[in-house]
Amino acid sequence: MKTYTKNPINPRDTRTFKGKDGKKEKEKFAVVPIPNTIETYVVSNYGRIFNVDKAYELEKRPLRKEDPKYLVTRINTRTDDNKVNCGSYAVNVLVANTFVKKSKRDVALNRVIVHPIDWDASNSRYCNLQWVNRTELSILKDIRDGKTEEKDYVRYVCLLLQLGYLNDDIKAIINLPMKAKVKFINDIRKRSIYPYICAKYKY
């Protein structure tokens, strides 16, 4: 994959932003991982996309009116029978596929959904994106919607243990509010707390 350390269209327009852990990072660029593109398209870890051949930044627009922050962009590709296809591609997915490398555990747990950590789908910076699966996304939605009593967290952990999750897997997805996070998970694993909830799950 070809990469650039500066904006390939206008090197002066290479941005600096807060990356992981709040540290300043310079924008990086790479050719989009889409086969059979007609022109050369480049995506940045800041969430910008450019057509290098025609020297312009691609417009990002909402996929649906009811979800104005979920942004897509249009990229031209060529089909097997040599026809032009103008397809819509989610900006977050392009950034994640390029700059958020999946770990072995991501693959093992079938994490194929790109989730914006701050729930702002228009924030396409790579450091705001994580790979999740449907079960994890459902749990994260429940937490966002206020289901945050201790017994709720017990249910979340029980469900993930039932699916074969390791302690580190659980901590990576759920920001458990208690200080003794590992002890909390292990107590649930041993069914020594909230036994009436734990009894509903097989692990």
Language-model region placement:
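Conserved recognition-core residues within compact binding domains
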Residues: 2-113, 120-169, 174-179, 183, ...
